[in-house]
Amino acid sequence: MMYHIPGVLSPQDVARFREHLEQAEWVDGRVTTGAQGAQVKNNQQVDTRSALYAALQNEVLNAVNQHALFFAAALPRTLSTPLFNRYQNNETYGFHVDGAVRSHPQNGWMRTDLSATLFLSDPESYDGGELVVNDTFGQHRVKLPAGDLVLYPSSSLHCVTPVTRGVRVASFMWIQSMIRDDKKRAMLFELDNNIQSLKSHYGESEEILSLLNLYHNLLREWSEI
């Protein structure tokens, strides 16, 4: 399943990020990809050795960790270190699949269950640059407002179309979920959304408490901690 997570960063935060990123040191994006990805990748990434990068990636982690909808959809166990990329002048990233595991500074290794892109450019400011994701439900083309995030299974083939005008800047990361199975995670997300909707309409009740009990028992049964 694919999820749109709105408002991860406020417009003020996005403007501040863009101002900082204009001063950042950018390097060839192929430095962080494997042999297969390097053949189809043509973009730039912020140099991860800089102090500016360390500060910005920490802010992204704080923002997603504090976003209730992100947590409900991803049920994250481990988040990768966020990276930042830039596309301009017909740069693109052809169809590829993300690696199944990635190194992690604290945990050694993490499994990539979900991929996330946090958009930092207004969609009207550039042409092209759509994230195209192929999954069991078909092909999805994504170009979200700045500050919004998209979550999708890391097992999906995906690409970024050429940016023919302007500049597309984004942050991206991977998530190891407490729930490995996409279908089970989607069911828990739907159940959680329905519980929250019922509570907002009817307040607390024995029936809602029973559903909440079911949610946590399923989470207990399926989670890998």
Swiss-Prot record:
Residue ranges of every copy of the Fe2OG dioxygenase domain listed in the record: 78-177
Enzyme Commission number: 1.14.11.-
Binding site for 2-oxoglutarate: R168
Cofactor: binding comment: Binds 1 Fe(2+) ion per subunit.
UniProt-listed PROSITE patterns: FE2OG_OXY
GO molecular function annotation: 2-oxoglutarate-dependent dioxygenase activity; iron ion binding; L-ascorbic acid binding
Residues that, per the record, bind Fe cation: H96, D98, H158
Keywords noted in UniProt: Dioxygenase, Iron, Metal-binding, Oxidoreductase, Vitamin C
GO BP: DNA damage response; intracellular iron ion homeostasis
Pfam families from the UniProt entry: 2OG-FeII_Oxy_3 (PF13640), PKHD_C (PF18331)
Cofactor(s) the protein needs: Fe(2+); L-ascorbate
NCBIfam families: PRK05467.1-1 (NF003972), PRK05467.1-3 (NF003974), PRK05467.1-4 (NF003975)
Protein name (Swiss-Prot/TrEMBL): PKHD-type hydroxylase YbiX
